[in-house]
A protein has these predicted regions:
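Metal-dependent phosphoester/phosphodiester hydrolase catalytic core
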Residues: 1-169
């Protein structure tokens, strides 16, 4: 396996073909669980798409973070009944940004949702798992676009989970 607190370089292959990258792709493993260690974590949220501000991702990446926690409103969908191409495009637009791609290629990303990731805060965990009709498709969309270590529990899909970096949980 990988050694703790070590940097590794990696390549991406699609159908056996090397995908070229503008920068060297790297990943740094966390310190051994329970081991005290300094680390850098970024916190972000309310990341609506405004083209002139999308350069912010390169500013965030310049801090060489060990992890980034996105605290919701990661994209602004706000129209849950229009699930489909509009929502896919909203994520595609963000994820195709070169500065964002560089950040996520080298920084572990953790995310939770808030109202703009769908709409109406209380609907996410309201009384009904599958109502309104758009609720489960929005949960599925979020999970397709964020590789989190957990998705709630079977009875109530969600975006809560825990993770550790060294001696911090």
């Amino acid at each position: 396996g990988l050694k703790p607190d070590s940097e590794y370089r990696y390549e991406t292959l699609i159908d056996g073909e090397l995908v070229k990258s503008e920068t060297a792709l790297r990943v740094r493993t966390y310190p051994r669980e329970g081991q005290a260690s300094a680390f850098r974590m970024g916190l972000g949220g309310c990341a609506g798409y405004t083209p002139i501000y999308e350069r912010m991702w390169s500013t965030v990446a310049s801090h060489d973070l060990d992890a980034m926690l996105m605290l919701g409103d990661n994209v602004y969908l706000d129209l849950p009944e229009m699930a489909g191409a509009f929502h896919d495009y909203t994520y595609y637009r963000r994820q195709s940004n070169p500065d964002f791609r560089k950040l996520v290629a080298s920084t572990p990303m953790y995310s939770i949702w808030d109202d703009h990731d769908a709409v109406i805060d209380d609907i996410w965990m309201g009384r009904y798992r599958d109502k309104p009709d758009w609720k489960q498709p929005m949960v599925n969309l979020f999970n397709r676009n964020w590789v989190n270590p957990g998705e709630g529990v079977t009875e109530w899909p969600g975006c809560w989970y825990s993770f550790s970096i060294g001696d911090v949980e």
